[in-house]
Amino acid sequence: MNRGNPQALRHPQVPLGIANIIGRSTFPSVEGYLALSLCVAFIASASVFTHFHSQPEIKRLLEEELRNNTRLTTAFGINIDTIAGSTVFQMAHYILTDTTLIWVAINSYFAILAMCTKLIIKLTFKELSRQEEVAARQAFLSYILLTIVYLSVVTGPQKGHRVMPWMIWGGVCGFLSHLQFVTCQRLKYTSPSCDRGSQRVSFISLFLFFVSIAMTFMVSRFQQHLEWQPAVLLYFDCLLAVFRSTYILFRCISSSRVFSFNPDSVRHFNYWLELATNFACELLQFLSYAQLFVFAPGLNLTSIFFLYHMKLTYNCMREQLGRHRTHKKIFEHIESAYPSVKAANSDDRCIVCWELLGTSRRLPCSHQFHDWCLMWWLAQDSSCPTCRYVIPSPQEEASRTDSGNGNTMFRFNGRTFGFFTLPSFTVEVGSSFGNIFGRAAEPTQEQLQSMLETVLEMFPQMSPETILADLRQSGSAQSTIENILEGRMGLNASLIPGVLDEDLSDDTDNELEYEEHVEVVQEPDRTRQRTWTKLSSSSGEAELSYYEIQRANMIETYRRKYLASDKAADLRAMGITE
């Protein structure tokens, strides 16, 4: 059974479809589902106990049915004579043979798994961010949709009692898939040096790994009771769970303090580990979809569904290989173009990952960054992350070469007709006529996904719909980031305290409490007024969070450094010194 697209571990999909509509609604919520399931289970349990106490003869009938049931003895080797007289087994048999109570039992099983998942996430990660909650909810709803289609194929020609084991198996796989997805998201966006809660993450990685191994042993134990087609599908599920759990376990090991002395080797290992795991999971999913497509009962909508997902999985594998080739070219360009130097101060940090610099690469603008940080940055933007100094990137050179190769040159030599001589000229015809009409080619869906992830990493408080709308207009992540920073799209100015403010008036109410120490400078060539605010030392820093205080202090420090530099000579001449 396939657990959605594992590419979502790296690149979240642009929200589309029914799963997104349900995922953004307030219903069904996990709390509401658990409360409703608890009420239904309580009513069903009370009904069963009342039925057993009001009709004592039902115990004798159930005991005879259990003694005549040979499937338990054949499949599990259980001695029926010893358990036939137990009231607990009689109740379980009664529930499993009732067409209504069995669905209540399955729903209670799903509710218990959902409650365990929520409890484990709460104990391990405390609170999830808004972006993580939305991504996890959409991935879970996509998994439910895929499971429904999957069950319609594997259980279509089978009897009702054979559907329940598949649903139990699907619940376990969904439980593991959701925990793996949330853990991978947290490992992706958390710095290795931030070891807060690392023990809890290590425990959950070991738990997921051992559960995946136990699932594999269980399938191998009961393989002889299954046909080869269902057994292969179950092994696909086990391999997917083992690969993802192994990836999480190795990421936790590589992020530990044991390997902190060599961060470049850790990044190199994590890159290849992620590439190999994603490609292996995509290949397993492709084979699983292919088997479901081939052995589906006739050509129907489910066949088209699996064929479509086969195409998506194949495209994901191609994109991963293409992205790997691009990163390889960029890394070779970094090694050949930018020298490797040591940081001037031992406490200097890379502004991309906020880790200690150590040995890093120096750009022409004299700013230093880690090899891997610079590679990931240049894959998105060909400029310095600090000063926006434009630097050459092999990605842009390749795109210019490709666009140049797609054009056709027509050369006309001048000829003489009587007394009239035609001039010689050259005409270049491009492969795309979009620029002729004043409109560039629109970005593809994959490019939009990559740019959306880039912007959301920097501004997680922004709405994905707002960012997508601006990306479709601007066509680049850099333009959208500039629009957000300059206040041209939906960013609340109260989120950036202590910075230069050219658009707000003096009487603007701030969400945070600041002392408005305002100086007004009349510029000779413009009638605009420049104001700024400074964090008040008497306003009570206890009301602000640690992050807000540190951010305001950092802005104040760099503002003073700028005023003391040569670039701020004009400001010092006006009397602005702090």
UniProtKB/Swiss-Prot annotation:
It is a multi-pass membrane protein. Its main location: membrane. SMART domains: CUE, RING. Keywords: Glycoprotein, Membrane, Metal-binding, Transmembrane, Transmembrane helix, Zinc, Zinc-finger. It is found in: Membrane. The keyword Transmembrane helix applies. GO terms for biological process: endoplasmic reticulum unfolded protein response; multicellular organism growth; protein K48-linked ubiquitination; ubiquitin-dependent protein catabolic process. The chain crosses the membrane at residues 32-52, 76-96, 101-121, 134-154, 163-183, 202-222, 230-250, 286-306. GO terms for molecular function: ubiquitin binding; ubiquitin protein ligase activity; zinc ion binding. SUPFAM superfamilies: RING/U-box (SSF57850). It comes from the Eukaryota. Glycans are attached at N68, N492. A zinc finger (RING-type) spans 350-388. GO terms for cellular component: cytosol; endoplasmic reticulum; membrane; ubiquitin ligase complex. The keyword Membrane applies. Residues 447-489 form the CUE domain. Proposed to have a role in neuroprotection. PANTHER family: E3 UBIQUITIN-PROTEIN LIGASE AMFR (PTHR15067:SF5), E3 UBIQUITIN-PROTEIN LIGASE RNF8 (PTHR15067). This is E3 ubiquitin-protein ligase hrd-like protein 1.
